Amino acid sequence: MSAPTPVLLMVRELDLGGSERQLAEMAMSLDRSRFDVRVGCFHAAGMRGEELRAAGVPIVEFPVPSLASFKGALRIAAYVREQGIRLVHTFDTSANLYGVPAARTAGTTRVISSQRADRALMPPLYRHGLRVTDHLVDAIVVNCEFVRRHMIEEEKAPAGLIHLCYNGIDTSVFRCIRGARPQGLQDASLVVGVVCALRPEKGLETLLDAFASIRGLEPGVKLVLVGSGPCLADLQHRARTLGILPDCLFEAATPRVAEWLQAIDLFVLPSLSEALSNSLMEAMACGCCAVASRVGGNPELVRHGETGMLFQPRDTAGLAQALRLLIHDGSLRGKLASQAACAIRSRFSREASAERMVEIYTGLLG
């Protein structure tokens, strides 16, 4: 039997974040008999680093004080050559901008980048830099059909370079179980909620406004927002102004994501922009009834009327209408939640994602 193929997966850091999570899931899911997986990063501290070490995945830190650091690039290139790395796969913007050129100088190594978001939201300098690195890679992996179209139609990337590999989640962790609700929600009759970063593009004002219009429908209904970010104070002020703060719970970002999702009945993702949302997939896997804005990759996860409900971004009335229907009709709520959980288990498990990525890797390695 031939020796496992050395591969290096790269990301800026190993803490909370969607790209960091997907890298960790992939590193732990790839067949060790076929791939000698190492993880490279600029900053090794963080929760994902702890998970990877516990799983026995080697972590190599390449200190990079800034993207202009030439020494850091030389270290990456030297490591790739010395270790005989045959494939380098970068998972986020910083790794794409810095790791791709460094790995390319190492010679025969195959280089893959990732695109997991709409580049229109990026600073122009970053977007230009990524367009340059698009011409240095052997493949670009995207996580949804929306991003694939964006890369071809707007970024003018060659269609043959683009490979679709949906994100995968650990369905042994994110599963349909209902236990005791966390503190602050024990007395709730029904919980509406979201788990996400509290950033402007998440459109969370729409959720607060819609909740204000429907909270009287069900005695004891509560709203929970789990996450941290720059919009926290503004969202709390808005909840206070709307008079709903007593029925709202703001919980900081936590690694106990599954526990919170399993306490939510109606998961609402009102994003203004989205690629493929890990939190939406995880919520559906946990048995939440999903309600999401019709943007980006959300419709690839939520089929309206089958695995959840969709509404137009910023449409407070449309979201409120969906919430009223689902609060009143428990049978429909349960049906949509059950069908969503089945869809996630069958199409978006980390095993399915790893199988697809292996197809991409082996196709490039020959």
Label the predicted regions.
Residues Q236-A252:
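Nucleotide-activated donor-binding/catalytic signature segment of Leloir-type glycosyltransferases, i.e.
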Residues G220, G318, L325, L332-R347, ...:
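A short, well-ordered alpha-helix in the C-terminal region of glycosyltransferases
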Residues C41, C289-A292, V302:
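Short hydrophobic beta-strand element within catalytic cores of glycosyltransferases
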Residues H304-G305, M309-T316, L325-S331:
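Conserved acidic donor-binding segment of nucleotide-sugar-dependent glycosyltransferases
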Residues L67-K71, R149-E154, G160-L161, Y166-Q183, ...:
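Acidic anion/phosphate-binding donor-loop and adjacent secondary structure
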Residues A253, L272:
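Aromatic "clamp/platform" in nucleotide-sugar-dependent glycosyltransferases that forms part
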Residues R110-V141, R149, K156:
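A conserved, positively charged/aromatic
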Residues G17-M28, L190, V194-S213, P230-H237, ...:
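A conserved mid-protein helix/loop that constitutes part of the nucleotide-sugar donor-binding site
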